[in-house]
Amino acid sequence: MCPDTLFVCSPHGENSGDGLFGRIADDLQDKGYSINPAVLPASLSDALLAHMLQMQDEQFNPAGIGREPRHMHNRFVRNDEICWITGESTAGRNWLRWAAELQTFLNRRLLLGLFSFESHFARYAPGAYYKRHLDAFRGDTNRVLSIVAYLNTDWAAADGGELVLYSDMTDRDGLRVSP
């Protein structure tokens, strides 16, 4: 399941700006999601991927579900590993800056009232998954927008890992978004 709005992008695209951000805003307003392949600046996506690949395994932790104090690890729901992007690296700072520019634009254009942003790398070993879910914490309405940026290179359909957006709880097929 997706939250009220979702933005999906893939690496190696044009620089961001009002054109891209305007398209995203229009899509969010019209459809509730925006899928934009190849829109992150290549320098940004390449730097993020390089940074992630040089990270030590210990920097990644099993992903959980829920927010404290209900946060838990549930390997039946998801078994990927995550590492928070804090801005300690140049790549992380640049990503957070890009996302902040998008946030500011969407706040002005759509009056969303977005006031915070958090981000992490998610690493999926072969066979790993994150099952169908609503991308929001139970009982909370604070997650308004989710961004998924694929950093994969040389992805093939056999690799799996598509994001599936469902329109509602009765939607069985969903809209598949490939990395």
Feature locations, PLM:
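Fe(II)/2-oxoglutarate oxygenase catalytic core
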Residues: 1-146, 150-179
